[in-house]
Amino acid sequence: MSSISDSFTRINFLYNINDLKNLISIFEYGILSKNSLIKKGIKNYTDLSNPDVQERRNNIRVPNHGFLHDYANLYIDARNPMMYFEINNKNINELCVICVDKKILDLENVVITDRNAATELAQFDEPENALRFLDFDSIFAKSWNHPIPYIKNELKAKKCAEVLVLDKIPVNYLIKIKVATQLAKENVEQLQLNVPIEIDKDIFFQ
Protein backbone atom coordinates (compact mmCIF):
# COMPACT_ATOMS: atom_id res chain seq x y z
CA MET A 1 0.00 0.00 0.00
CA SER A 2 1.49 3.34 -1.04
CA SER A 3 1.93 6.13 1.49
CA ILE A 4 1.40 9.87 1.14
CA SER A 5 5.14 10.45 0.84
CA ASP A 6 5.33 8.10 -2.16
CA SER A 7 3.19 10.52 -4.17
CA PHE A 8 5.88 13.22 -3.85
CA THR A 9 7.98 11.73 -6.63
CA ARG A 10 10.02 14.89 -7.26
CA ILE A 11 11.24 14.98 -3.67
CA ASN A 12 14.21 12.87 -2.55
CA PHE A 13 14.76 14.48 0.84
CA LEU A 14 13.54 17.45 2.81
CA TYR A 15 16.15 19.84 4.16
CA ASN A 16 17.05 21.80 7.27
CA ILE A 17 19.72 24.51 7.03
CA ASN A 18 21.65 24.74 10.26
CA ASP A 19 24.84 25.60 12.11
CA LEU A 20 27.36 22.85 12.85
CA LYS A 21 27.34 23.89 16.51
CA ASN A 22 23.72 22.71 16.81
CA LEU A 23 24.30 19.18 15.52
CA ILE A 24 25.00 17.55 18.90
CA SER A 25 21.72 18.90 20.28
CA ILE A 26 19.81 18.02 17.10
CA PHE A 27 21.00 14.41 17.11
CA GLU A 28 20.01 14.11 20.75
CA TYR A 29 16.58 15.77 20.72
CA GLY A 30 15.67 16.03 17.02
CA ILE A 31 15.09 19.22 15.04
CA LEU A 32 12.95 21.25 17.43
CA SER A 33 10.52 24.08 16.82
CA LYS A 34 11.40 27.50 18.28
CA ASN A 35 8.86 27.01 21.07
CA SER A 36 10.07 23.48 21.83
CA LEU A 37 13.62 24.81 22.22
CA ILE A 38 12.32 27.29 24.79
CA LYS A 39 10.29 24.63 26.64
CA LYS A 40 13.32 22.34 26.87
CA GLY A 41 15.44 25.22 28.13
CA ILE A 42 18.02 24.81 25.36
CA LYS A 43 19.80 28.15 25.35
CA ASN A 44 23.13 27.42 23.66
CA TYR A 45 21.48 27.05 20.26
CA THR A 46 22.87 29.09 17.36
CA ASP A 47 19.97 30.67 15.50
CA LEU A 48 20.63 31.37 11.82
CA SER A 49 17.38 33.19 11.25
CA ASN A 50 16.82 36.90 10.73
CA PRO A 51 15.31 38.39 13.94
CA ASP A 52 12.89 40.59 11.99
CA VAL A 53 11.64 37.61 9.99
CA GLN A 54 11.29 35.53 13.15
CA GLU A 55 9.23 38.25 14.81
CA ARG A 56 6.84 38.05 11.87
CA ARG A 57 6.76 34.23 11.91
CA ASN A 58 6.01 34.26 15.63
CA ASN A 59 2.64 35.86 14.92
CA ILE A 60 1.57 33.77 11.93
CA ARG A 61 -1.06 31.18 12.71
CA VAL A 62 -0.95 27.78 11.00
CA PRO A 63 -4.49 26.81 9.91
CA ASN A 64 -4.29 23.33 11.42
CA HIS A 65 -2.95 24.24 14.85
CA GLY A 66 -0.88 26.86 16.62
CA PHE A 67 1.67 29.26 15.21
CA LEU A 68 4.72 28.90 12.96
CA HIS A 69 7.04 28.81 15.97
CA ASP A 70 5.22 25.67 17.15
CA TYR A 71 6.61 23.87 14.08
CA ALA A 72 10.05 22.66 13.07
CA ASN A 73 10.57 23.74 9.49
CA LEU A 74 12.13 22.04 6.49
CA TYR A 75 12.66 23.20 2.93
CA ILE A 76 11.74 21.26 -0.18
CA ASP A 77 14.92 22.64 -1.75
CA ALA A 78 17.83 23.89 0.37
CA ARG A 79 19.47 25.73 -2.52
CA ASN A 80 17.25 28.69 -1.84
CA PRO A 81 17.30 32.39 -0.84
CA MET A 82 17.90 31.58 2.83
CA MET A 83 20.98 29.54 1.93
CA TYR A 84 22.18 32.32 -0.35
CA PHE A 85 21.82 34.79 2.50
CA GLU A 86 23.68 32.51 4.93
CA ILE A 87 26.68 31.85 2.70
CA ASN A 88 27.08 35.60 2.23
CA ASN A 89 26.77 36.44 5.92
CA LYS A 90 28.37 33.49 7.70
CA ASN A 91 31.49 31.34 7.52
CA ILE A 92 30.57 28.60 5.06
CA ASN A 93 32.55 26.09 7.14
CA GLU A 94 29.97 26.54 9.91
CA LEU A 95 26.96 25.71 7.75
CA CYS A 96 25.34 22.35 7.10
CA VAL A 97 22.21 20.89 5.56
CA ILE A 98 20.46 18.04 7.34
CA CYS A 99 18.71 15.69 4.91
CA VAL A 100 15.42 14.43 6.31
CA ASP A 101 13.53 11.34 5.15
CA LYS A 102 10.48 12.40 3.15
CA LYS A 103 8.49 9.78 5.09
CA ILE A 104 8.09 12.57 7.64
CA LEU A 105 5.20 13.56 5.35
CA ASP A 106 3.32 10.47 6.53
CA LEU A 107 3.16 11.68 10.13
CA GLU A 108 0.23 13.53 11.68
CA ASN A 109 0.43 17.28 12.30
CA VAL A 110 2.52 18.00 9.21
CA VAL A 111 1.70 21.00 7.02
CA ILE A 112 3.13 22.05 3.65
CA THR A 113 3.31 25.60 2.32
CA ASP A 114 3.63 26.56 -1.33
CA ARG A 115 6.21 29.26 -0.51
CA ASN A 116 7.94 30.95 2.42
CA ALA A 117 5.41 30.49 5.21
CA ALA A 118 5.89 34.07 6.42
CA THR A 119 4.67 35.63 3.16
CA GLU A 120 1.14 36.98 2.82
CA LEU A 121 0.10 34.73 -0.07
CA ALA A 122 1.36 31.47 1.45
CA GLN A 123 -1.04 28.54 1.15
CA PHE A 124 -1.06 25.90 3.90
CA ASP A 125 -2.42 22.37 3.67
CA GLU A 126 -1.87 18.80 4.78
CA PRO A 127 0.51 16.70 2.63
CA GLU A 128 -2.28 14.68 1.01
CA ASN A 129 -3.70 17.89 -0.47
CA ALA A 130 -0.55 19.91 -1.09
CA LEU A 131 0.45 18.60 -4.51
CA ARG A 132 -2.32 20.70 -6.03
CA PHE A 133 -0.52 23.95 -5.22
CA LEU A 134 3.21 23.13 -5.20
CA ASP A 135 5.04 24.67 -8.16
CA PHE A 136 7.99 22.27 -8.34
CA ASP A 137 9.49 23.93 -11.40
CA SER A 138 9.87 27.16 -9.43
CA ILE A 139 10.93 25.38 -6.24
CA PHE A 140 13.76 23.51 -7.97
CA ALA A 141 14.75 26.31 -10.37
CA LYS A 142 18.45 27.21 -10.27
CA SER A 143 17.63 30.91 -10.10
CA TRP A 144 14.82 33.11 -8.89
CA ASN A 145 16.04 36.19 -10.72
CA HIS A 146 13.62 37.99 -13.06
CA PRO A 147 13.55 41.48 -14.61
CA ILE A 148 10.02 42.12 -13.35
CA PRO A 149 10.20 42.78 -9.57
CA TYR A 150 6.90 41.23 -8.51
CA ILE A 151 7.65 38.03 -10.47
CA LYS A 152 11.11 37.90 -8.90
CA ASN A 153 9.55 38.19 -5.43
CA GLU A 154 7.07 35.44 -6.30
CA LEU A 155 9.83 33.11 -7.48
CA LYS A 156 11.97 33.93 -4.45
CA ALA A 157 9.11 33.08 -2.10
CA LYS A 158 8.28 29.82 -3.89
CA LYS A 159 11.92 28.69 -3.69
CA CYS A 160 11.38 28.62 0.08
CA ALA A 161 8.36 26.29 0.10
CA GLU A 162 8.26 24.62 3.52
CA VAL A 163 7.27 21.47 5.33
CA LEU A 164 6.20 22.23 8.90
CA VAL A 165 6.26 19.51 11.54
CA LEU A 166 4.54 20.15 14.87
CA ASP A 167 6.98 20.34 17.82
CA LYS A 168 9.90 18.33 16.41
CA ILE A 169 11.40 16.16 13.71
CA PRO A 170 12.53 12.92 15.41
CA VAL A 171 16.17 11.86 15.16
CA ASN A 172 15.32 8.65 13.28
CA TYR A 173 14.23 10.75 10.27
CA LEU A 174 17.64 12.43 9.97
CA ILE A 175 19.37 10.60 7.11
CA LYS A 176 22.61 12.43 6.29
CA ILE A 177 24.44 15.75 6.48
CA LYS A 178 25.67 17.88 3.58
CA VAL A 179 28.49 20.41 3.92
CA ALA A 180 30.35 22.70 1.52
CA THR A 181 34.00 21.99 2.31
CA GLN A 182 36.42 19.30 3.40
CA LEU A 183 37.10 21.24 6.62
CA ALA A 184 33.40 21.28 7.49
CA LYS A 185 33.18 17.55 6.74
CA GLU A 186 36.08 16.81 9.07
CA ASN A 187 34.52 18.95 11.80
CA VAL A 188 31.23 17.04 11.55
CA GLU A 189 33.05 13.69 11.49
CA GLN A 190 34.58 14.55 14.85
CA LEU A 191 31.09 14.69 16.35
CA GLN A 192 30.55 10.95 15.61
CA LEU A 193 26.87 11.28 14.76
CA ASN A 194 26.70 7.95 12.91
CA VAL A 195 25.18 9.37 9.72
CA PRO A 196 26.78 9.83 6.29
CA ILE A 197 28.44 13.20 5.65
CA GLU A 198 28.95 14.42 2.12
CA ILE A 199 30.35 17.49 0.41
CA ASP A 200 27.78 19.06 -1.91
CA LYS A 201 29.10 22.32 -3.31
CA ASP A 202 26.08 22.99 -5.50
CA ILE A 203 23.60 23.20 -2.64
CA PHE A 204 25.85 25.88 -1.09
CA PHE A 205 26.10 27.85 -4.38
CA GLN A 206 29.78 26.91 -4.77
Where are these regions (language model features)?
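Active-site-proximal loop/hinge segments that shape catalytic or ion-binding/gating pockets
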Residues: 1-206
